[in-house]
Amino acid sequence: MMYAFLRALMRTITRVYLAGLFEVVGVENVPLTGPLIICPNHSATLDPPMVPAFVPRSDTWSMAKSEYFRRPLVRFFFYAYHAFPVVRHSADRAALRRSFDLLKSGQALIMYPEGTRIESGVLAKPEPGAGFIAQKAACPVLPVGLTGTRECLPKGARWPRRTRVSITFGKPFLVQQKRADGTRVSHEDASDAIMVAIAELLPLEQRGLFSEVELHRKRLTGVTAPIADPPAGEGRA
């Protein structure tokens, strides 16, 4: 109940405050049931509360840096918003276990492949964790492109600015463990492939390390596979 209320509150605040400036694109691409790894880019504090609010599923969970869970009141709200702690830049076994348990039970996991907020606002090198989880769970990955969130809530700002913000859901795909020739796909290449899919949803100026999309696609041939006719919904969150 608390999660549903917080999501509805976030949607309402966003749509009212950013009236005429906010849009959600591609929500029909989101599988409404079954295990799903949702991977957005991350350049603003606004991203983690916004993404779950507009995913048209109520069974989404998010990884959040463990530092947020040190204070009881903050920890309460993070858990209420379906977030669980992860120790960044490490092989956090507890977080990995929680992730696989959620996916095994058919729920959705939101994780940011870069592993942290990228203050430059452009795509950076991802951590291998997203690729590892996607390969081991063998479930669909949904790329998400966020634009305008950094401008809306810059680092250090006390109040959001009225600026254009968009959430674009791409088409889900699978990350392979082996290429067609039998060579193993590394976790690093798997994570890079996820970032390329995110880059395709962003304007060129936000693509950063993945600006040369076609070159990366060629390098990563056989790392991903499309999903035919994913179970998608027509409605809006």
Predicted regions and their residues:
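A short, well-structured juxtamembrane/interface segment
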Residues: 12-35
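A conditional alpha-helix N-cap/helix-loop micro-motif detector
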Residues: 20, 89-93
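A secondary-structure boundary/capping signal
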Residues: 26, 41, 64-65, 82, ...
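Non-catalytic C-terminal accessory region of glycerolipid acyltransferases
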Residues: 2-5, 9, 94-237
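Short, basic, glycine/proline-bearing loop/turn elements
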Residues: 10-13, 80-86, 113-117
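Catalytic core of membrane glycerolipid acyltransferases/transacylases, capturing the structured
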Residues: 6, 31-90, 98
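Short, well-ordered coil/turn elements that cap or connect secondary structure elements
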Residues: 17-19, 57, 75, 136, ...
